[in-house]
Each structure stands twice: as structure tokens, then as C-alpha cells.
């Protein structure tokens, strides 16, 4: 008689072990292992089996290839993020917090494609058909070629996709679907992994662009096994406060284009719309205030004008606070230490708070100079002209380094009527912006 083998799986990350573990060695989750039954083990073994290869290896120079066919999503900002549009046969995963606009955006994409006489299927496991139609009426998304399906049974959904010649498909959401062949609840690791694998095969074999909406965990990552993100061609993530109009779409993985671009949307009565004059969303045009400084950051090929806001106040307790929203806290601590060392400013007795307007997160060092200028402005209670921008990276020895692609930043300043720029070196090309050189942090204090 064959010996019975057991297999346990972590419900957080999908890690498998031949014995039960109190703590997952991969994701460090406690008491997350459950024993798989025979059917689940067969599915797992099927997924692990390599696809047999009949052909021999071929020289890469001898392989004939075709360019990836892309088509417009009808949403200009989404096309920018995807690198020029949706690829035929592409599998896209879209995540974001509840209410941020995932379903709204993809319903508008589906409607836009259907308007161009393309047959599109929208599968919802969360809303009834009448609820979806009410939302479609509000968003003006009623199209004859847009088909709705309210179903969570995966074999039924798969049969529907295979029975019709759909151009694209939207799954809302992957965590609500289940396959009867796997005896676990919808949204479990096994269910999500198997159904995503089937969707990947459908997308490639039938040349259908498929969008999957994914829920997120309380830590902010997409719920489900990590293999989910490896299976898909692109991972898109919505950022933004649901209570505000602005939404930012980022690409964390894209097999068909760059991952450095971002898309900017505004939530209006007619749903998510591509933001016009994007830079104007991130800075104030009102009278200048203490603690505010302007900078220009690059997100992919796009230059954005941002307002850095600082608040410096006397410390009420022994240990001062350093908090940043949209800016790296470790880099903020470094800049504060630099001001204390080089300029002898007693920030060790002050709380320092930094905020990047618009809710955007910046990581490029070229914004360092604006952060320092905003801190000095708040500390000295001096206003900075809101037609002046600060561009430059600050090194540990107090020197200011040139921001890359400076001409693109200055051109964006010209478009919005800015007059002056503080930077370490004057630009090589002519510009209407008056550029003032400051190659060290001490020069900023003199200028202020």
C-alpha cells in the first residue's frame, strides 16, 4: 500500500511544505498553513509540470519575429502607462484600494472599445447586471457590443469566452471567482493561481486582451500568491485618496513597454477622465506662504511641477519628529543633518514635517533643493516667490548637483509662466527662465 503523502500550503503567499509549519518561512505569516486535499495537489502538480518541448534550440539570430500589435484603450493616460496602448493577447492586472476607480476605468475602456465595433465581455462577480447598467448609464457607457456576465463559476465563464469571438475581456474581480475542481473558497491561493493560469492560456491562444481586477491586502499589496504577478504581462496600480479627485496610475511591470510612466486621472461626475494640464494639479497659484517651494520632477517622459510644503515647529518633547508624506523619510533625515552640520541651524530642537502636494510620491534626488528651501522658509518665516523653482540634488558634503534632463524641466516651467530657477549650473540651451547659480547649500541661505 502506497504511503500517504501530505502537502500544506500557506494561504498568504502560496508556499508549500510537506509538513505543517507554525510560521511561513517565505512570508513570515503565523498559522497560515492548511492541508491540501488530493484534487488540490493534482492541480498544483499539473501547474508545476513543464510544458514538453518538441523542437530543438534555435539561434536567436535565425528566429523570425513580428512586432507586438497594439491598439488604443480609448483612454489617453492609460495608453501612456501601457507604452502605446493595449497589446493583443496581453494579460493585465489592475490593483488599488477600494473606491479608487478600478472598475470605473475598465468599464470606460470596455465601452470605448465596444464603441469602435469591437466585441467586449465584462465579467462581474461583485455586482448584478442591473447595478452595472446603472453605473454604465451614469458614465455614458451604453454600447451594443459591450456584453455583461454576472457569474463567479469559472467553467461557465471560460465556456462563454470560448464560445464567442471577443476582442477583449474584463474580470471584476479575480478574488470572487471559483473553480469547482478545487475544493477551497473563492479568493484562496489555489483558486486564484489556477484561474489566473487558465486566463493566461486563454489570452495567448485566442489573442484576447484580458484585464483582471485584483483586491489589495491591508499592507497595500495585491491579494493572492506572488505567482499571480509573475503570470500576467503587466501590473498596474492605482494610487490616490478616494475622497479626492486626483488618481495616479503606475506600472510596476510591463512586458510591452516601460515601467517609468504614470497616468493622471480625475474623478468627475462622468467617471474617471484623463487629467488635462497635469502639472497645474500639483501646485498652488495663490499668494506664496512660508514653508512652500516649487520643484519639477520627471515621471518617465513627463515633467510635473510640484509644490513641496514644510512645517518646522519647536519640539514639545525630548525627541523631535521627522515625518514625510510623499517623500522618503530617510532622505529627509539626511538633509536635516546636513543643514545642522553645514549651516548650524538648530533643527535638533524642532519637529520637521514635509508634504508633497497632490498626494504624489517622489523618489528622484533632483527635488532635494526644494525640500531644503521649504524647510528654511518655514524655519525663518520667509516667503518664497511662487514663480521660482528649485532644481538640484544635494550631496552629503553640501554641494548641489545638476538635475538630469534640465531642459525638459525648464520648458515645463515656461509653459506655466515661471520666471526664475535656482540651480547649480546654467542650462546649455537658451531659455526665458532667469537662472541663478547655487552650487552649495550655503548659497541658498544667502539667496533667501
From Swiss-Prot:
UniProt free text on domains: Has a putative N-terminal zinc-finger, a middle region with homology to RecA with ATPase motifs including the RadA KNRFG motif, while the C-terminus is homologous to Lon protease.
Residues given in the record as ATP binding sites: 96-103
Keyword entries, A-Z: ATP-binding, DNA damage, DNA repair, DNA-binding, Hydrolase, Metal-binding, Nucleotide-binding, Stress response, Zinc, Zinc-finger
Motif (RadA KNRFG motif): 253-257
Task performed by this protein: DNA-dependent ATPase involved in processing of recombination intermediates, plays a role in repairing DNA breaks. Stimulates the branch migration of RecA-mediated strand transfer reactions, allowing the 3' invading strand to extend heteroduplex DNA faster. Binds ssDNA in the presence of ADP but not other nucleotides, has ATPase activity that is stimulated by ssDNA and various branched DNA structures, but inhibited by SSB. Does not have RecA's homology-searching function.
Protein name per UniProt: DNA repair protein RadA
Pfam families xrefs: AAA_25, ChlI, Zn_ribbon_LapB
UniProt zinc finger (C4-type) residues: 10-27
GO biological process: recombinational repair
Disulphide bridges: none
GO MF annotation terms: ATP binding; ATP hydrolysis activity; ATP-dependent DNA damage sensor activity; damaged DNA binding; zinc ion binding
EC number annotated for this UniProt entry: 3.6.4.-
Homology family: Belongs to the RecA family. RadA subfamily.
Chain segments carrying region Lon-protease-like: 351-448
Enzyme class: hydrolase
Amino acid at each position: 500500500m502506497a504511503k500517504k503523502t501530505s502537502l500544506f500550503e500557506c494561504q498568504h503567499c502560496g508556499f508549500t511544505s510537506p509538513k505543517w509549519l507554525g510560521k511561513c518561512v517565505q512570508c513570515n505569516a503565523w498559522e497560515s498553513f492548511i492541508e491540501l486535499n488530493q484534487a488540490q495537489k493534482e492541480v498544483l502538480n499539473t501547474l508545476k509540470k513543464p510544458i514538453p518541448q518538441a523542437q530543438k534550440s534555435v539561434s536567436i539570430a535565425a528566429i523570425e519575429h513580428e512586432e507586438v500589435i497594439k491598439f488604443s484603450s480609448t483612454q489617453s493616460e492609460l495608453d501612456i502607462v501601457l507604452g502605446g496602448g493595449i497589446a493583443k493577447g496581453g494579460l493585465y492586472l489592475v490593483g488599488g484600494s477600494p473606491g479608487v476607480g478600478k472598475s470605473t476605468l475598465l468599464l470606460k475602456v470596455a465601452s470605448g472599445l465596444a464603441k469602435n465595433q469591437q466585441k467586449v465581455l465584462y465579467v462581474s462577480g461583485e455586482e448584478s447586471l442591473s447595478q452595472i447598467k446603472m453605473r454604465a448609464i451614469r458614465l455614458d457607457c451604453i454600447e451594443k457590443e459591450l456584453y455583461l456576465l454576472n457569474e463567479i463559476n469559472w467553467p461557465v465563464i471560460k465556456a462563454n469566452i470560448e464560445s464567442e469571438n471577443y476582442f477583449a475581456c474584463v474580470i471584476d474581480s479575480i478574488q470572487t471567482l471559483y473553480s469547482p475542481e478545487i475544493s477551497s473558497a473563492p479568493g484562496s491561493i489555489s483558486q486564484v493561481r489556477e484561474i489566473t493560469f487558465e486566463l493566461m492560456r486563454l489570452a495567448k491562444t485566442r489573442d484576447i486582451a484580458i484585464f483582471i481586477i485584483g483586491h489589495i491586502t491591508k499592507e497595500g499589496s495585491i491579494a493572492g500568491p506572488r505567482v499571480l504577478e509573475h503570470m500576467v504581462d503587466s501590473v498596474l496600480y492605482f494610487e490616490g485618496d478616494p475622497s479626492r479627485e486626483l488618481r495616479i496610475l503606475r506600472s510596476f511591470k510591463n512586458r510591452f513597454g516601460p515601467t517609468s510612466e504614470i497616468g493622471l486621472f480625475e474623478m468627475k461626475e462622468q467617471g474617471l477622465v484623463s487629467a488635462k494640464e497635469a502639472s497645474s494639479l500639483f501646485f498652488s497659484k495663490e499668494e506664496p506662504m512660508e514653508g512652500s517651494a516649487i520643484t519639477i520632477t520627471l515621471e518617465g517622459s513627463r515633467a510635473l511641477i510640484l509644490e513641496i510644503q514644510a512645517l518646522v515647529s519647536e519640539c514639545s518633547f525630548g525627541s523631535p519628529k521627522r515625518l514625510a508624506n510623499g517623500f522618503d523619510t530617510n532622505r529627509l533625515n539626511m538633509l536635516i543633518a546636513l543643514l545642522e552640520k553645514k549651516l548650524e541651524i538648530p533643527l535638533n530642537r524642532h519637529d520637521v514635517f514635509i508634504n508633497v502636494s497632490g498626494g504624489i510620491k517622489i523618489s528622484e534626488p533632483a527635488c532635494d533643493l526644494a525640500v531644503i528651501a521649504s524647510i528654511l522658509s518655514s524655519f525663518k518665516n520667509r516667503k518664497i516667490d511662487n514663480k521660482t523653482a528649485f532644481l538640484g540634488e544635494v550631496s552629503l558634503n553640501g554641494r548641489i548637483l545638476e538635475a538630469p534632463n534640465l531642459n525638459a524641466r525648464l520648458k515645463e516651467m515656461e509653459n506655466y509662466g515661471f520666471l526664475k530657477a535656482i540651480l547649480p549650473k546654467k542650462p546649455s540651451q537658451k531659455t526665458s527662465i532667469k537662472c541663478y547659480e547655487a552650487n552649495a547649500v550655503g548659497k541658498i541661505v544667502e539667496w533667501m
